[in-house]
């Protein structure tokens, strides 16, 4: 579970949509199973499938609950849309998240719509985070605000900031412009649950303040745990600035990457047969390397796992 990473374009992170908690978690799980480095993904490459047991394990729920949750969330998801606005031009895009789903006795297959592909593949400005940090959120707005705050921190190249947003803009982003006219109700049902989720389950610490009489501005005092290695560019810069030594490893990055490329190529040409875990893990490692240009973001556990797999097939 800790290896699943969500990649999203910045535009998608601040888009307008209204999904339930379970619909949001289903989407994030599916996004984390994609390979974001693929160019011009085919229908097969934008298709995600997993068993109900796998989903239950990923989300820490029972197998029986997994089927019911997935069935309801998937049916509703087929009717949901996402709205993306370009601040530089008037107008906006509206499209579906997915356009096909298939249930069998053991697994779910879901296909992302073609219109959403530019916001999930070949990304230039994007956010990324471990699915582990949001899977336990209890409020549907918590995941939205987590992504928005992460985008702001990433753009500012910092792990700590006071991020301001007008109350109207905040409600517009969450499609709440016609709800919670009294601030105390918004605070009770939206802001406090968001703070509780982020402070309890995620790698963010959050305090929400307000300004104005009546309130017209929200101030999010947010701090990202730098040890979680989610903002890779920031981490690399801080290591250089602080003069910290990068832990030495037996296998150099270039040697490790060459071994990774050979292994994936040999698997593609059927010279070797990877297990499902190995195939997903190596594909994820290649995706992250392509996006970051190095393996400096690897945890020791990830590096050891990668080295063991490559050594198993004689590629290092």
From Swiss-Prot:
<dbReference type="GO" id="GO:0006270">
    <property type="term" value="P:DNA replication initiation"/>
</dbReference>
<dbReference type="InterPro" id="IPR000525">
    <property type="entry name" value="Initiator_Rep_WH1"/>
</dbReference>
<dbReference type="InterPro" id="IPR036388">
    <property type="entry name" value="WH-like_DNA-bd_sf"/>
</dbReference>
<keyword id="KW-0614">Plasmid</keyword>
<comment type="similarity">
    <text>Belongs to the initiator RepB protein family.</text>
</comment>
<protein>
    <recommendedName>
        <fullName>Replication initiation protein</fullName>
    </recommendedName>
</protein>
<keyword id="KW-0235">DNA replication</keyword>
<dbReference type="Pfam" id="PF01051">
    <property type="entry name" value="Rep3_N"/>
</dbReference>
<dbReference type="InterPro" id="IPR036390">
    <property type="entry name" value="WH_DNA-bd_sf"/>
</dbReference>
<dbReference type="Pfam" id="PF21205">
    <property type="entry name" value="Rep3_C"/>
</dbReference>
<dbReference type="GO" id="GO:0003887">
    <property type="term" value="F:DNA-directed DNA polymerase activity"/>
</dbReference>
């Amino acid at each position: 579970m800790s290896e699943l990473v969500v990649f999203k374009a910045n535009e998608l992170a601040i888009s307008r949509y209204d999904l339930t908690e379970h619909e949001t978690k289903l989407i994030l799980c599916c996004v984390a199973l994609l390979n974001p480095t693929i160019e011009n993904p085919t229908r097969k490459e934008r298709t995600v499938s997993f068993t109900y047991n796998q989903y239950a394990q990923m989300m820490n729920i029972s197998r029986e609950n997994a089927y019911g949750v997935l069935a309801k969330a998937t049916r509703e998801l087929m009717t949901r849309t996402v709205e993306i606005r370009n601040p530089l031009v008037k107008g906006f895009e509206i499209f579906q998240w997915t356009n096909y789903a298939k249930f069998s006795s053991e697994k779910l297959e879901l296909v992302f719509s073609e219109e959403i592909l530019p916001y999930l593949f070949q990304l230039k400005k994007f956010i990324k985070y471990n699915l582990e940090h949001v899977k336990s959120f209890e409020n549907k707005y918590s995941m939205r605000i987590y992504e928005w705050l992460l985008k702001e921190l990433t753009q500012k190249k910092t792990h700590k900031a006071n991020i301001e947003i007008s109350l109207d803009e905040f409600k517009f982003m969450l499609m709440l412009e016609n709800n919670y006219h009294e601030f105390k109700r918004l605070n009770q049902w939206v802001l406090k649950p968001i703070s509780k989720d982020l402070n309890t389950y995620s790698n963010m610490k959050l305090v929400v303040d307000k300004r104005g009489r009546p309130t017209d501005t929200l101030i999010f005092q947010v701090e990202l745990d730098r040890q979680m290695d989610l903002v890779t560019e920031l981490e690399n810069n801080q290591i250089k600035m602080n003069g910290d030594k990068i832990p030495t490893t037996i296998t150099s990055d270039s040697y490790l990457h060459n071994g990774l490329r050979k292994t994936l190529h040999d698997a593609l040409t059927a010279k070797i047969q990877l297990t499902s875990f190995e195939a997903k893990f190596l594909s994820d490692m290649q995706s992250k390397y392509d996006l970051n240009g190095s393996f400096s973001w690897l945890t020791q556990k990830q590096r050891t796992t990668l080295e063991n797999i490559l050594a198993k097939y004689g590629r290092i």
